[in-house]
From Swiss-Prot:
Binding-site positions, 4-amino-2-methyl-5-(diphosphooxymethyl)pyrimidine: 36-40, 68, 106, 135
Name this polypeptide is given: Thiamine-phosphate synthase
Binding site for Mg(2+): 69, 88
Function comment: Condenses 4-methyl-5-(beta-hydroxyethyl)thiazole monophosphate (THZ-P) and 2-methyl-4-amino-5-hydroxymethyl pyrimidine pyrophosphate (HMP-PP) to form thiamine monophosphate (TMP).
Length: 207
C-alpha cells in the first residue's frame, strides 16, 4: 500500500475545540487526506461509535483514518492505522496484534525516530516543531531537529506541533511527507476554510 500520498494533510480531532464528527466532515470537505481520532480517557463504547462514523466519512472522501493509541478501537472500526506514542503499546507488539494496520510512531528526538523505524513503524509523527497549545509540556525540536529526522530515516515523516498557515511552508521545505495539525484547523471558526488554506500551500510545495 502506498499510503505516503495520503499523509500530506493529517488532521487530528480535539473535542476541547470542536465535536468530532461535524469537524471531521468539514476538514474532509476542505481537503484533509488523513484523519486521526484522538480522545483521551473516553469510554471505549463512545470511541467505537464515533470511530464508526468517522470511518464512513473517510471512506466517502478517500482519506485514511487513524486512531490514537487504541489498537482495539482501530481494529473494531476497521481504521487504516493507529498512532502510538512512547507510553503506548510497543510497536513490535502492535504489529503482532494487528499486522494489517499502518503503524505511526510519535517521536520527539532523532534517537526515538531511529528506534521507531528499527522496530517497524510505517511512518513517524515528529515534533514538536514549534511550541503548541495542545501539548504545553512537550519538547520542541525546531525546524533543524525536524530536518535531522527527515534526513536520517527512510520511512515517511509527518511534522506536528504548532504548525499553522504562517509557518507551514518552512516546515514543508525540510522534506517532510506531510503535516499534522490540531489547533490550526480545529481551533478556527471555519474548519473547512482553514483546511483549504493549508491544502493550497501543501499542493504548491509538495505538488
Amino acid at each position: 500500500m502506498n499510503f505516503k500520498e495520503k499523509l500530506k494533510l493529517y488532521i487530528i480531532t480535539d473535542r476541547r475545540l470542536k465535536p468530532e464528527i461535524a469537524s471531521v466532515k468539514q476538514a474532509l470537505e476542505g481537503g484533509a487526506t488523513s484523519i486521526q481520532l484522538r480522545i483521551k480517557n473516553a469510554p471505549t463504547r463512545e470511541m467505537y461509535e464515533i470511530g464508526k462514523e468517522i470511518r464512513k466519512l473517510t471512506n466517502e472522501y478517500g482519506a485514511l483514518f487513524f486512531v490514537d493509541d487504541r489498537i482495539d478501537v482501530a481494529l473494531a472500526v476497521n481504521a487504516d492505522g493507529v498512532q502510538l506514542g512512547p507510553d503506548d503499546m510497543p510497536i513490535e507488539i502492535a504489529r503482532e496484534i494487528a499486522p494489517n494496520l499502518i503503524i505511526g510512531a510519535s517521536v520527539y528526538s532523532l534517537e526515538e525516530a531511529l528506534e521507531a523505524e528499527m522496530k517497524g513503524a510505517d511512518y513517524l509523527g515528529a515534533g514538536s516543531v514549534f511550541p503548541t497549545q495542545t501539548k504545553k509540556d512537550v519538547k520542541v525540536i525546531g525546524i533543524e531537529g525536524l530536518r535531522e529526522i527527515v534526513n536520517a530515516v527512510k520511512i515517511p515523516v509527518v511534522a506536528i506541533g504548532g504548525i499553522n498557515l504562517e509557518n507551514v511552508r518552512e516546515v514543508l521545505l525540510t522534506g517532510v511527507d506531510g503535516i499534522a495539525v490540531v489547533s490550526a484547523v480545529m481551533g478556527t471558526e471555519d474548519v473547512k476554510r482553514a483546511t483549504e488554506g493549508l491544502r493550497r500551500i501543501i499542493e504548491e510545495v509538495l505538488g
